[in-house]
Amino acid sequence: MISQERFLKVLLSPHISEKSSISMEKFNTVVLKVSRNTTKNEIKFAVQNLFNIQVESVKTVYVKGKKKRQSNRIIYRSDWKKAYIKVKKGQNLDFMSNIE
């Protein structure tokens, strides 16, 4: 069993973009930024326990950090992990109303 403290460290924030809003409407899929060292099972249990919804599947993607230029220096943004969480039909993940 994963501790409550670990659940809160797994999920970092929702990823808001045009693609994520389309996937939410069409496929009932939520996109979240998660910690880089988490597994799919940890993500699934964290979402189910924190938001009280049933998760159908979890898919993860590593996003490579971009190379940015700042005056005459090159700066690299850090890599991060994104999780596509498919919620079962009839359930919805609303971030503002489910937080206790």
From Swiss-Prot:
One GO BP annotation of this record: translation
A single GO molecular function term of this UniProt record: rRNA binding
Any matching Pfam family: Ribosomal_L23
SUPFAM superfamilies: Ribosomal proteins S24e, L23 and L15e
Annotated Gene Ontology cellular component terms: ribonucleoprotein complex; ribosome
Keyword set, alphabetical order: Ribonucleoprotein, Ribosomal protein, RNA-binding, rRNA-binding
Coiled-coil blocks: none
Keyword Chloroplast: no
The protein's role, per its UniProt record: One of the early assembly proteins it binds 23S rRNA. One of the proteins that surrounds the polypeptide exit tunnel on the outside of the ribosome. Forms the main docking site for trigger factor binding to the ribosome.
Family note: Belongs to the universal ribosomal protein uL23 family.
Subunit structure: Part of the 50S ribosomal subunit. Contacts protein L29, and trigger factor when it is bound to the ribosome.
UniProt name for this protein: Large ribosomal subunit protein uL23
